[in-house]
Amino acid sequence: EITTRLVGSEMCIRDSNKDRKLLSLYFCAGCPTLEGTGDVIKAMERKGIDMIEVGIPFSDPLADGPVIQSAGTVALKNGMTVKKLFAQLKEIKDEVQLPLVLMGYLNPIMHYGIEAFFKSCVESGVSGTIIPDLPFDDYLKVVKPIADKYDIRVIMMITPETSEERIRFIDEHTDGFIYMVSSASITGAQSSFGDAKLAYFNHINSMNLRNPRMIGFGISNKQTLTSAQDNAAGAIIGSKFVTLLNETGDPDKALDGLFECLEK
């Protein structure tokens, strides 16, 4: 069985039974409401989500599509900050068993302080981080030693444009999982994956990497979900869930709506 478990703050995904696939969801902290972070996370845990990506809003998010950009804008207007987010996560730390992964750009993390950021991750029950604009050399020289000190996983992204040499290097120097982006373009829902993407998934699988993979960006229905889960340890859904959360204003309703979409 694939289990996502926390040992201290270690996140391990074990992929031994191909029938059990992970589903991870992303939402932007502070959207639609400033104080709703804990409610969204607890609803996800109740509904059986395996892992949660909590977005740190930033004013210039390069990889984000319009849905997540606009969620970030709302969150910033609502007053969400890195400090506020850590305080919210700390409040629910004892109630939440799921692995939490913070996804945010380098600028707000550096502004908070890299060491302070990873220390706060431990204190608030965060297992891993995804920093889309973190150059790999800076990860190795600056970020990895600090993350390792606090036993926090730094998850790296790969795209169809990432060279095989770089993918092997990432596989060797990171733990947790590799985030396979199904497209080099910005995030957003898609109705299906074309042949080129499926060939890319097959190619990555043929590399026999030591880290499990999760596929994200563009998953919004049964076809894209199945395709992602057939080709990796699981799927990550962002834009579709964020849209539903904004429309309903209620995490339980948004999750029910998402599960409905994933059946179609």
What are the roles of these predicted feature ranges?
Residues D64-G72, V143, K240-K264:
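C-terminal helical cap(s) of enzyme catalytic domains, especially alpha/beta-barrels
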Residues I68-A71, N78, I167-S206, N246-G249:
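Glycine/Thr-rich beta-alpha phosphate-binding loop at enzyme active sites
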